[in-house]
Amino acid sequence: VESLRNSDCWYIKSCNEDCGRCVTYTQLKWQMDNSGLYLSQQKPIELFIDEQNSVDRQAYKALGKIRNHITEFVDEHRNLYICSREVGNGKTSWAIKMLHTYFHYRAKGNYENLLGMFVNTTDLLLRFKDFNNPVSQKYKDDLENVDLVVFDDIAVTSNISQYDYTQLFNIINKRNMAQKSTIYTSNITEYSELEKLLGPRLATRIYDSSEVIELKGAGRR
């Protein structure tokens, strides 16, 4: 019988089992597919230090430590703010890698119990306004209640309406109140700038509740 091997399996280098019969693969794949990650973002990510980003050696070390202990990070209700003025130097990749790792450790036995989500903040704000494809109440509930959410490119725009602000504030505030872990990525490195874009109430809930790690290396795009 021909073995059903998936070339995109996260364990392909260390496993020879039939993916079609693998409970681990099935449960991890379900988490990935329902998290909001694109297929390209579901693939394993390799991050490394080279001449372009050698300035980030300590930041990579700190991020690697969080990633290696991501279950403790979530269980301790911690938040993370990964920021950089540079584009393409690993902010989003690190956040996704942490979400992958959390799924790896916690997906087993959690089939159809969503553990984490990835959200492009700009897309979310656009969906708040899209009456043809509105954000469902279930989606909002999941954003407020899953163990770990990645808000990618938070504060990427200053053109945020009061309605958008209220929706975003409510989700983030409820996560903080419920002691749910959140990872933010942003090109805003200073609190004062974040406050100008999002206002003090939301900026405080994002920045002051998070461990802040700044990347300064050049982008690879």
Positions of the model-derived regions?
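Surface-exposed alpha-helical segments enriched in charged/polar residues
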Residues: 64, 68-71, 100, 173
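Walker A/P-loop nucleotide-binding motif
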Residues: 74-96
